[in-house]
Amino acid sequence: RIRVGNILTDSTNFTFVYIEESQNEAIVSIPVQLVGKATDEPRPVNIKVVGGSAKEGDDFVLPANPVLPAGASSFNYEITLKRSTALQEEAKTIEIAIEENEYFRPIITHEITDIQSGTDVSTMRHKIEFSELFTEAPAAWYTYIYPFTPQRFFLTCRVMDIPRSDFNDASKISSFRFQYLMSEMVKYVAEQLLLENPDPEIFDENGTPIF
């Protein structure tokens, strides 16, 4: 079971867009919570892939022999996601489920998240969706100052030598710094246009400068 704020959720969305290009893998950590008493013995947990479009081994790797440690009431189930060019076109999914074994028997399979509507989530299954796509502009890309496009984002990170993850953290890039970055990018593109062989990444698919 995972909580986002105070809300229980049975799904995780992950994108590689904020991960540097040199990094080919990322780990998604799924908390597994015990309902019951902890014991002084480690206990294996039976977690299996039950669906999804991603292929085990090619797109992701599961932990070998997950175990709830002795004395613990929870542990993190860490799935290694593999980066591929296909993720730039569409998302892939993994669906996992906790299954009964000699140590654990499911008692609570769903929990209600909204009493009025009766909306509930599964406590035994979890879906991971991952891609290298943007679902929205980064937190520190101030669209009222300069409209966002993925191409502008990637070019800015490269030219200004800024980690991609910084753009998803408003404490690292203020609106004032963002204004400076945009002015520098406009200047960079203008300088490139004067060259015989300008940086090809300054043009969109129609050949128009992106800044």
Q: Where do the protein language model's features map onto the residues?
A:
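Beta-strand-rich extracellular modules
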Residues: 82, 97-101
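Exposed aromatic-hydrophobic patches
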Residues: 74-82
